[in-house]
Curated annotation (Swiss-Prot):
Aminoacyl-tRNA synthetase is among the record's keywords: yes
Annotated residues for binding of L-glutamine: D68, Y213
Gene this protein is translated from: glnS
Known partners and oligomeric status: Monomer.
Motif ('HIGH' region): 35-45
Keyword field: Aminoacyl-tRNA synthetase, ATP-binding, Cytoplasm, Ligase, Nucleotide-binding, Protein biosynthesis
InterPro entries the UniProt entry points to: aa-tRNA-synth_I_CS, Gln-tRNA-synth, Gln/Glu-tRNA_Ligase, Gln_tRNA_ligase_bac, Glu/Gln-tRNA-synth, Glu/Gln-tRNA-synth_Ib_cat-dom, Glu/Gln-tRNA-synth_Ib_codon-bd, Glu_tRNA_lig_a-bdl
Annotated GO MF terms: ATP binding; glutamine-tRNA ligase activity
Organism: Ectopseudomonas mendocina (strain ymp)
One BP term from GO: glutamyl-tRNA aminoacylation
Primary localisation category: cytoplasm
Family note: Belongs to the class-I aminoacyl-tRNA synthetase family.
One Pfam family it belongs to: tRNA-synt_1c_C2
Protein name stated in the entry: Glutamine--tRNA ligase
Catalytic activity, EC: 6.1.1.18
Lineage summary: Bacteria, Pseudomonadati, Pseudomonadota, Gammaproteobacteria, Pseudomonadales
Length: 555
């Protein structure tokens, strides 16, 4: 199988890792991919997965899969299973078993107690609204909580009672004692623990207090010996807090945080909240709808792991933002499928053709290559008196430049004979329901003498073809920036009404009858398609269009 032919773009982290290894700062690189299990992974996560696993692979290190499971109210085992499946589908394997931040809850609690004993943390009774008021703004410093000067003994007692479940949700929190006047709002006495009486998918009902992301993340990195903690740029302002915890706790290692620009893809939404809205309101048919930006959606659409990895190589890793053209992703899958997808013929809008001068009862088994370059063998197409062509390939009154079948005109059937249109049969409403044609028996594999036939069209045998459903997927949003809408509008206003067209009664060549789920094809002259992962069955295939043969949006 060929790989997509793309060059790796620059990755500013590669020389940093190389220098750390060369200097002996680290004997081995250890990275991690730390998703929160509160939704399905999307194309933006693919960039982080390829980056973290790719660096570890390139430099002979390891990458951990760690679930940042500190908010049980929004998390679910369903998401954990889906995330693991997506990472494996992309072609990566994490070191050892998957890890959970909840594995470290006991240690994190012990460290929180140490901060209290050192006078660096306190129990605060402010509610969320009061805390926002006290925190200040980007232009105004915050104010100290009235509970900031509680004694160590009182804080230890209250924190123990928080852990014992004596207080309701939100009644108290544990906060670090740093600097309410800091220009970095993240350092204004951030929350370490919240009260949440919620069942946890890993720890059950053991805990009713849960650590914040900021308190959990760096310490989990340290416990696992992470050398390069790589996250997106929105966490750059969190780095001083990340480092404050590491400096003020007896952690076993000192990881370093690096930030890169997240993936912004035009015509695409990756907000978990908005993706969930699309699902919940029925705008799409689930998280794995082939129009979704989720990895499970791309997989069902027919994208290959190799194409997504190639795309991530193409866009590179840097600290500068910007919007990536979705055409680059479509280029990557076209390159992959052009090189690796078997060819086949499928007629989306069948028009019956009767070849009047072809002997009745005669059948020729024509062999066509499964791929023009790779040695994939051949497929057999029975050719007889009755076939189907696509209705769009015949025009009674053709526009200028039309090179397909017209009254009295000739075309070549792909891999077969030249035929001439002699008569169009119509129903009472004037619709063409059948063509009567004649064939030139001397044109199998060669041009007719004395005349030039320009057009080549695809076809399938009438008797042996298999009926199928074809789903023509297109971009879910018609706007390059779907987040932008008219005043008072919503991103939903940008949904493309033609993002899915379902065609039934299509006719596919016989070899497609037993297409396996996720088997990919180039339907000649139509595009790249995949047998649907869920709905396609032997004898009743369902095909999803992955991408058109060419970029029709850029024209």
């Amino acid at each position: 199988m060929s790989k997509p032919t793309v060059e790796k773009a620059a990755n500013f982290l590669r020389p940093i890792v190389q220098a750390d290894l060369d200097s002996g700062k680290h004997a081995k690189i250890v990275t991690r991919f730390p998703p929160e299990p509160n939704g399905y992974l999307h194309i933006g996560h693919a960039k982080s997965i390829c980056l973290n696993f790719g660096l570890a692979e390139e430099f002979g290190g390891q990458c951990n899969l760690r679930f940042d499971d500190t908010n049980p109210a929004k998390e679910d085992q369903e998401y954990i299973d889906a995330i693991k499946a997506d990472v494996e589908w992309l072609g990566f394997k994490w070191a050892g078993e998957e890890r959970y931040a909840s594995d470290y809850f006991d240690q994190l609690h012990a460290w929180a107690v140490e901060l209290i004993k050192a006078g660096k943390a306190f129990v605060c009774d402010l509610n969320a609204e009061e805390m926002r008021t006290y925190r200040g703004s980007l232009t105004e410093p915050g104010k100290n909580s009235p509970f900031r000067d509680r004694s160590v003994e009182e804080n230890l007692d209250l924190f123990a009672r928080m852990k014992a479940g004596e207080f309701p949700d939100g009644a108290r929190s544990l906060r670090a004692k740093i600097d309410m006047a800091s220009p970095n709002i993240n350092l204004r006495d951030p929350i370490l623990y919240r009260i949440r009486h919620a069942h946890h998918h890993q720890t059950g009902d053991k805990w009713c207090i849960y650590p914040s992301y900021d308190f959990t993340h760096g310490q989990s990195d340290a416990i696992e010996g992470i050398t390069h903690s790589i996250c997106t740029l929105e966490f750059e302002d969190h780095r001083p807090l990340y480092e404050w915890f590491l400096e003020n706790l007896p952690v076993p290692a000192q990881p370093r945080q690096y930030e890169f620009a997240r993936l912004n893809l035009n015509y695409t939404i990756t907000s978990k909240r908005k993706l969930k809205q699309l699902v919940d309101e029925g705008h799409v048919q689930g998280w794995d709808d082939p129009r979704m930006s989720t990895l499970s959606g791309y997989r069902r659409r027919g994208y290959t792991p190799a194409s997504i990895r190639a795309f991530c190589d193409m866009i590179g890793v840097n600290r500068a933002g910007g919007v990536v053209d979705i055409g680059m992703l479509e280029f990557a899958i076209r390159e992959d499928l052009d090189a690796n997808a078997a060819r086949a013929m499928c007629v989306l809008k069948p028009l019956k053709v009767v070849i009047t001068n072809y002997p009745e009862g005669k059948v020729e088994n024509l062999e066509l290559p499964r791929h023009p370059k790779q040695d994939m063998g051949v497929r057999v197409l029975p050719f007889s008196r009755e076939i189907y062509i696509d209705a769009s390939d015949f025009e009674e009154t053709p526009p200028d430049g039309f090179k397909r079948l017209i009254p009295g005109g000739e075309v070549r059937l792909r891999g077969s004979y030249v035929i001439r249109a002699d008569e169009a049969i119509k129903d009472a409403a004037g619709n063409i329901v059948e063509l009567r044609c004649s064939y030139d028996e001397n044109t199998l594999g060669k041009n007719p003498e004395g005349r030039k036939v320009k057009g080549v069209i695809h076809w399938v045998p009438a008797a042996e073809s298999v009926e199928c459903e074809v789903r023509l997927y297109d971009r879910l949003f018609r706007s390059a920036n779907p987040e932008k809408s008219e005043e008072g509008g919503s991103f939903l206003d940008n949904i493309n009404p033609d993002s899915l067209v379902v065609l039934t009664g299509c006719r596919a060549e016989p070899s497609l009858a037993q297409a396996a789920p996720e088997e990919r094809f180039q339907f000649e002259r139509e595009g790249y398609f995949v047998a649907d992962l869920k709905d396609s069955q032997p004898g009743k295939p369902v095909f999803n269009r992955t991408v058109t043969l060419r970029d029709s949006w850029g024209q």
